[in-house]
Amino acid sequence: MQIKGYDIIGINIGKYSHNNNTAISLDCNEGVFATITVNLDENLDKDMAYLDTNNCSWVEDIMEKYCLGEPTGKYKQSGFCIYPLYKLDLKAIKELDNKIRK
């Protein structure tokens, strides 16, 4: 999987320490390529996350291309940015991670 000329070698699913919301980051050979989620002041279900479309303008295309989640139609503003809420397919994310780590 390539994004902006970088080979993505892993997908990490973790939690934000503040409220245990799901955090997702992508690794490349040089280290962490991007954290594609943002942690806003809202407790979410494990399979929900706001995507960082501000710093990762390509993230919704990746979610659609690899069937990793669906937009809920809900958005939340933080500062000057508005972030889309996605229902994540955690199983598909883990399967893609396993595939690209091989």
Predicted regions and their residues:
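OB-fold ssDNA-binding interfaces and closely related basic DNA-contact patches used
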Residues: 1-28
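Short, flexible beta-strand-to-coil junctions
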Residues: 25-32, 73-78
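Acidic, aromatic-enriched beta-alpha/helix-loop junctions
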Residues: 27-68
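Short, compact, well-ordered microdomains
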Residues: 53-102
